[in-house]
Curated annotation (Swiss-Prot):
Pfam families: Ribosomal_L34. The gene is rpmH. This is Large ribosomal subunit protein bL34. It comes from the Bacteria. InterPro entries: Ribosomal_bL34, Ribosomal_bL34_CS. The keyword Ribosomal protein applies.
Length: 44
């Protein structure tokens, strides 16, 4: 059986990147929560 994690930078950025987060209301909510928590990295 192959491993389930087959990394792709493009897919990663499109699904979890900063611009993907900013594109939706809930995505902006995630970023706000991560800022409030003091995360060093906000998005992938």
């Amino acid at each position: 059986m192959k491993r389930t994690f087959q990394p792709s930078v493009l897919k990663r950025k499109r699904a979890h990147g900063f611009r993907a987060r900013m594109a939706t209301k809930n995505g902006r909510k995630i970023l706000a929560a991560r800022r409030a928590k003091g995360r060093k990295r906000l998005a992938a």
